[in-house]
Amino acid sequence: MPPGLRLFAIPGLPEIRKGEDLAERIAAAARTEGLSFEGGDVLVVAQKIVSKAEGRVVSLVTVKPSAKAQELAAHLKKDSRAIEVVLQESRRILRSDRVLITETHHGFVCANAGVDHSNVPGDDMVTLLPRDPDRSAELLAAALHRKTGKRIAIIISDTFGRPWRLGLTSVAIGASRLPVLRDLRGTRDREGKPLTATILAAADELAAAAGLLMGKSEGTPAVIIRGYRFKPASEKAASIIRPADEDLFR
């Protein structure tokens, strides 16, 4: 068989709650679908279920908006309580014209600091990003190794917008046990010309591929990618974030 990738969606996960064994839930759902893990698989998991398992869910009923949150909410015509949560999850505000773009404590630049109303029960509930997505990925990789005996790489994905293109795409916000970047500098193209600047965001590309099977309403928060060739590595998704001193727009 020629080399290629195969992707397997893992549907049927129940609503995840704080403290649940996410590795067991995923493994059980895979078994129900007749799927088993193999060494070298990459498991892409939606951020939302990781956040729920870690208790990163906030009831807006408990939030008291600050004066700054109320000011921004009036300007943006948003719930001031949700804006307050965004401010608490942010290092700084980058834009507040039509949407609130912030830099999170992780260093991500995204809308609303990743605070999200979707796919969480209740009108006044929001989810937050995991505190340390790379650590979350490593803990999940270790737990699945114990349960399956297989060494599986993990990517935690979330959907981000892009400044100059329409539409959302899935990116890696956490990773474990695989290279997140493919540095091709120093190699040559097919014409023998040296590559001097090419670094591929491999983890983001894998997250985007899995995102085609996840969707927003399909109830498929986990996807197995099989056939991707890589050497195990201890790189973190945090290393994909461009340093501020190299960023022309921040």
Give the positions of each predicted feature.
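N-terminal and secondary-structure boundary signal
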Residues: 1-250
